[in-house]
Amino acid sequence: MTSILREQRRDNVWDRFCEWVTSTDNRIYVGWFGVLMIPTLLTATICFIVAFIAAPPVDIDGIREPVAGSLMYGNNIISGAVVPSSNAIGLHFYPIWEAASLDEWLYNGGPYQLVVFHFLLGISCYMGRQWELSYRLGMRPWICVAYSAPLSAAFAVFLIYPIGQGSFSDGMPLGISGTFNFMFVFQAEHNILMHPFHMLGVAGVFGGSLFSAMHGSLVTSSLVRETTETESQNYGYKFGQEEETYNIVAAHGYFGRLIFQYASFNNSRSLHFFLGAWPVVGIWFTSMGISTMAFNLNGFNFNQSVLDSQGKVINTWADVLNRANLGMEVMHERNAHNFPLDLAAGEATPVALTAPSIHG
């Protein structure tokens, strides 16, 4: 009998850690990007939850009029938010150690910067982790490319827009009603509804929803029957099976006759590329629109642009939209200034389209 003695493998702790981090056998892949993603997202999540529940009011406008955003100060899930950092801080980096006290840091909205910076770093690492796992599994890198669309949108509203406007107080509040307030103010100050990049973004999001619903319903309607009438159709599919689970020829024929022949894809790969690319490109355009409007390259302005033969203004929808913008702008930061800039300078703008005659 021959005995073979193998030398015991002597990996140090660092080598075993590297192997664990990059192993695709783990239930959840960590990756080197995950080493940074996990602590940053945990920090952002914990700080957001604590601030949403218990943060004191924040002097967002920098005029010593704090705005309460937490649940303990009278808000509910809808109205609550982590209020952006003070206009007095501007674009300054404001970590805890830059404040004279913790109370001052809370009063000036320090938690907002802490959450946003850790969140942006964390989701960037998440995209890198997607690429890393795809690389290790020998897959193409398009998953992280698709994820870059919502990532760019987050960077646009939380970082690029405040930089362009000169203060993190102009960033999007971290709450439901705060998000809608941000949208209203953005429309009032930048006329985003009249910006072509926003229009492309709307087409991307709603078009993507439509295409997703159409694709899902077509596939579900053309499944290859593998079960009886009394069983769920889902039991007719076995994970990893080689056979097609639906009849793409039937789906192509149906949709081609419903619209016209060339509106229907006859190639499953090109179809799924289109389903992925359409919303991604649309959201990319929206992010670019936010980033350009951050520096006040605003949407189209057709106000008072249609005149009759005598030179009088024929009011269009653009003029109605302009009055709505002025109304929203007046309500925004009502105590920070007496009038919005475009109301305080220039000729007076009539509030009503026509003034009724009153006969007493």
UniProtKB/Swiss-Prot annotation:
PANTHER family: PHOTOSYSTEM II D2 PROTEIN, PHOTOSYSTEM II PROTEIN D1. This is Photosystem II protein D1 1. The record marks Y161 as: Tyrosine radical intermediate. InterPro entries: D1/D2, Photo_II_D1/D2_sf, Photo_RC_L/M, Photo_RC_L/M_CS, PSII_D1. Belongs to the reaction center PufL/M/PsbA/D family. The D1/D2 heterodimer binds P680, chlorophylls that are the primary electron donor of PSII, and subsequent electron acceptors. It shares a non-heme iron and each subunit binds pheophytin, quinone, additional chlorophylls, carotenoids and lipids. D1 provides most of the ligands for the Mn4-Ca-O5 cluster of the oxygen-evolving complex (OEC). There is also a Cl(-1) ion associated with D1 and D2, which is required for oxygen evolution. The PSII complex binds additional chlorophylls, carotenoids and specific lipids. A quinone binds at H215, S264, F265. It catalyses: 2 a plastoquinone + 4 hnu + 2 H2O = 2 a plastoquinol + O2. Chlorophyll a ChlzD1 binds at H118. Photosystem II (PSII) is a light-driven water:plastoquinone oxidoreductase that uses light energy to abstract electrons from H(2)O, generating O(2) and a proton gradient subsequently used for ATP formation. It consists of a core antenna complex that captures photons, and an electron transfer chain that converts photonic excitation into a charge separation. The D1/D2 (PsbA/PsbD) reaction center heterodimer binds P680, the primary electron donor of PSII as well as several subsequent electron acceptors. Chlorophyll a PD1 binds at H198. It holds the Pfam family Photo_RC.
